[in-house]
């Protein structure tokens, strides 16, 4: 089985005690659980372009000694899945019982069904969707970054001023999941 992660987490989503945006999947992993380690070989690799370890815009370009920054090649969903496929080939995995993932990991699972339908028996796309939530498309997000005074044409590394837009983008994303309503119901205003 392949477990795919979202933008704001990594393979640590399967590690007990790790707190990630999509919530820990550690309770789902182990003998007799949905991700049954007695029945399946479970792989959860880091996503291409992720800030949690694989190559991305903040990776050092060996030709310049600086981060790739805006010169980093564009990555598509198909690219991410192709890299996962290549990893599985190197591990000797020829068939997957399932590909499952939350959030953007769910999009990856769906892409697996499109790119390698004969290799995958089932997909699980959880807390995901077929389209971006309204106002959170890749282009609108890129434009919000480009309009920020600290953007500097994409050369913003080490500039703490980008934190405010990243924080607001995360809040907006969580609101689109309905978490604001959930929190209001669980933690009513004491006033």
Predicted regions and their residues:
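Conserved hydrolase catalytic core segment
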Residues: 94-137
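Catalytic micro-motifs at enzyme active sites that drive phosphoryl/nucleotidyl and oxygen chemistry
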Residues: 29-33, 87, 109-111
